[in-house]
């Protein structure tokens, strides 16, 4: 018996018939890239302005706003059969409105690196790209194994305590219950714990915080931190500050395979 294809909120999705014409709109940048990696770019009819990879493939695809402020009327005009969304990245009221006229709304929510495997298989299964999905799974497994084999010395040395910053004015970070924190944990980097229960808490710089971290990480997205920000903050706080590629750490989907290799480089630098 073929396994049911259930998304992140438990909704079961039918497999697309080979003769059925799919029209996909993606509101999730990393999932848009994954759709293309699965060979489904010809079915993609709409994307957000933040869906930028692969660049040449996506240039002719219509933009329908941002991840938080989509143009509902434009999506309606595109008449999608499938909508790809994410619990963290898209607004639920917007998704609820879109679900009234889009037949299939596929909800994603990877919270750990290994969740990429089920994501590949979910989308590959729905759209008849099982072979492509399994190829991605194999590549992910190889990259994860290579990363794990490079880490025994790091594990013996104990965790490296970090604060991963995603925004300033106000300063914001991530909780340990996030994909980002669990990616960092693969190389023994332990994300700072906030007193807040929010997944993306606001924080203030103070001595207790600084006493409990070894290094500050500034992500290149969603806030566009630069080396200039890193240098200024290091002078101000007297703690090591490093700029990291946010796409490599936070993008799940096919980008996660490159992300694992990037983590290996980070851990050895």
Where are these predicted regions, by residue range?
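N-terminal ligand-binding lobe of clamshell/alpha-beta domains
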Residues: 1-269
